[in-house]
Structure formats: C-alpha cells, structure tokens
Amino acid sequence: GITSYYDDLFLARSRTIAPEAYLRLLAQSITRVQQTKGRLKQSLAESSFTAWNKFYKQDENSPNAIVSYYQKGALAALCLDLVVRNKSSGRHTLDSVMQQHYRDWLDTRQGIPEKQWQARCQAFTGLDLEDFFQTTLYTTADLPLAELLATIGIGLQWQAQPRGHGGAFLPEPPTETPAPASDFGARFKQNSDHATLTHVFNGGSAENAALCPQDKIIAIDGYACTDLTAQWAQLPIGATARLHYFRTGILYVADITVQAAEADTAVLYITDRELFENWLYNDRA
C-alpha cells in the first residue's frame, strides 16, 4: 500500500502531472475503496494475509467480501503521513520514516518483521501511533480521510452519484450537494439485447430483488434491455420496475425497487492552495 501511495504522488511531485490531476486520481482511489463493501468485512491485515487465496483468486462475490490492500493501503499511507506530520508539528513525515527504514536496511541487509515496522516508526518519530496502527490495520473502520485531508487544505464531499462516476476534483468548493442518483446495485456486461450481471452488491436494488451474477436481464417494464444504464437512470427513486430475466435458461419475472445511490463517491476540492502545495511539493525529506 505504501508503494501504491507513492506511485501517483511521485508523478505530482515531479510535476509530470498537475496538482489537480493528482487530486482527481486520489478522489478515484478513495471512491473505489468506499464503494467496496468488502472494506466493512476485511481488515487491511487480513487482506494482506489472504492475498494469494482471495485477492488474487477473486470470484463473483469478491467486492462484497474483500478489500484491496493496494488501494486501501495507499490511503492508509496517506493518513499515516498526515498523522505523523500533525503529531510531530511537521518535524517528521512518511518520507523521513521511509528514508530511516532504508538506512536501517543498509546497515543490516535484513527485512523487517511485521510488528517492527510500527515499532521503528514510533522510535524514529518519538510518537505514540498505537491507536492509529491498531485501528487502521486490524479493524474495518473507515479511514478518517476528511478530517486529515482538511489539515493540508483539501476538502472532501461525499456524493450519491451513479457508480460509473468514479470520483472527481472540483476547481471550486461545491456550493450544494447534488440530489442522489439511482443505483442498480450491480456490475453488468451490456449486450445488444440483454445485460448479463457479473457482480451483485450487498444491500443494493439488484440484491434486494434476489438477482444473482450471471442473470441475463432481457426486459425492463416491457422494453428490451438494450441499455440498462440509461433505462435505469430514467426511473425515479422509489419506483418499482418489472424485470424479465433468464437464469440457467429459465425465464423469471421480478419486481425491483429503484434505490438511491449511497453517498460513496468522493469529490475533492482545494480549500487552501498554499497549504496543499506545501504538502505536495515537500522537499525536506
């Protein structure tokens, strides 16, 4: 996760991409994690430990059961950097911690046991980070992103956008929260005359209508399912639609209620550009 965090950050620090482009990438990363139901069931430590038999062998239910230790790990690294900066009044950063780890490796040429990373981080910075590491690594609690991003001049607003929105950066702080969009609650592959479900998300419209992966939706309210995204978007929240679909070659009919999207799309904006760029282009490390 730490290396994933630096992937995009180094592009911004080297001015290969603009600060606004970096924030757009960050908003997309935050959104991907927030829209993963598995984040509520699997901790970062569990995700790492079971990577070879779960993360790298994903199935139709994986979005409901696991979280990416790359994606959430990158956000955890961002949070760690901001916690270290705040607690040390700017004397230490994640950069300086990583450099100290590298110097230690040069002396010993040995790797770091699991608990030693935290111990060395605390010893080097002189900070008590036990609560942060315990909560971040070993529980399924959401990361305090809004609170920490505010310390570097970045605002975070959660919006109930369609799942395909993906997160965004706004040049100006939003003056209002958009009305919630509708959400079908599933991923699907659209074909010319039907949509085949690939993943059904916990708690969404599709799951509540007892739909399953591999179901082939052929009609919505009597009309051929030629564009499920567009047809679903035309239905008002709270309405009931009738679906015709095939499952294992058998035709079924189900009524589905149009649910509002969850407020899980991240929109970032700059509240203090000087503060943000001082963090982004930090040259002390």
State each model region's role.
Residues 7-8, 16-285:
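C-terminal recognition in membrane/secretory proteostasis and scaffolding
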